[in-house]
Amino acid sequence: MMMVMAATGLPELDVARIVKYCASRVPDRLRHEIRVECDIALRHVTICECRPPWREDFGPEWTRFPIARLSYTKKTGLWTLYWRDRNLKFHRYQFLAPSPHVQDLLDHI
């Protein structure tokens, strides 16, 4: 089976699956209060919780809080789940082995 890579070097279908996962996390009626979005980089996708500004004088920008990172290793074809600590550093999640199926990681989040 041939795997198509996005411009980032990540499998396109897996990236689409992650984007769809994020969009489905919050019902439409609550999207003005909270959203789940993803930031796509060369070798990983970071899932973020987004909240609107809580004070008008802070501007219109929503606050982004990274909650998980899905890292892809092209050589092995495996996805690995990382969690973020209070110091903004990501650590490998030890309770889930890397998987060739990104859905395995999404099911665990």
Feature-to-residue mapping (PLM):
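Negatively charged, low-complexity tracts enriched in Asp/Glu with abundant Ser/Thr
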Residues: 1-60
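Generic preference for hydrophobic/aromatic residues in regular secondary structure cores
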Residues: 36-40, 67, 90
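Short, compact, well-ordered microdomains
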Residues: 76-109
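Short, conserved beta-strand/beta-arch hydrophobic-aromatic motifs that form part
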Residues: 46-83
